[in-house]
Amino acid sequence: MGRGRVELKRIENKINRQVTFAKRRNGLLKKAYELSVLCDAEVALIIFSNRGKLYEFCSSSSMLKTLERYQKCNYGAPETNVSTREALELSSQQEYLKLKARYEALQRSQRNLLGEDLGPLSTKELESLERQLDVSLKQIRSTRTQYMLDQLTDLQRKEHMLNEANKTLKQRLLEGTQVNQLQWNPNAQDVGYGRQQAQPQGDGFFHPLECEPTLQIGYQPDPITVAAAGPSVNNYMPGWLP
């Protein structure tokens, strides 16, 4: 399979462009030399690099002679050459006059926009100048307003980001404070829980004392009750008595 067509375009990479230029330049000079030797042709080759460096090859003894021969062949006879030169000079002069008039008009317009040299202007020209200034002021104000709005939007975005970061830092600070409190007093919750559980047990322990007052220390039984209970005690005779 043959190679496909390669699109010719400028090489963007500077180093690759320089390397390709050196290779193609040497190849082109070699081809020009081979053409002049093999075919006995008069060949002149002029190359300027992108940096302005000159590379040339001429198969004859002088590049100037080859260029003179080229001019004679290109412009024809001397009469034709003179007429062509005159036409070229006339065209160049006309182009120069046009560019000069354009430059002077731009300079005059710039001075008028700055408020200078307004005396020669007519009423219509002054009105046109005023409209131009109004349009320019509107564009300037619109650009300034848009720039200020963009700055305000950017500041609001930064403010929102700072507020979110502040909230996050406050939350982390609060969590860190709680963790430090638990580390300094790890039994705080256990002590409170023990107190809550011990209170019902104390109430149940002392509750029978209130219901049975006869169990109090230093209580003397009623003698009548003891005397009544005496006969029942005497009716029982142990077996070891005589």
Curated annotation (Swiss-Prot):
State which tissues express it: Expressed in flowers and seeds.
Q: Name one GO biological process term.
A: flower development
Q: Which GO terms describe its molecular function?
A: DNA-binding transcription factor activity, RNA polymerase II-specific; protein dimerization activity; RNA polymerase II cis-regulatory region sequence-specific DNA binding
Query: Is Cell membrane one of the keywords?
Result: no
Q: Which domain of life is it from?
A: Eukaryota
- What is the protein's known function? Probable transcription factor involved in flower development.
- What name has this protein been given in UniProt? Agamous-like MADS-box protein MADS4
- What species is this protein from? Vitis vinifera (Grape)
Recall the taxonomic lineage recorded for the source organism. Answer: Eukaryota, Viridiplantae, Streptophyta, Embryophyta, Tracheophyta
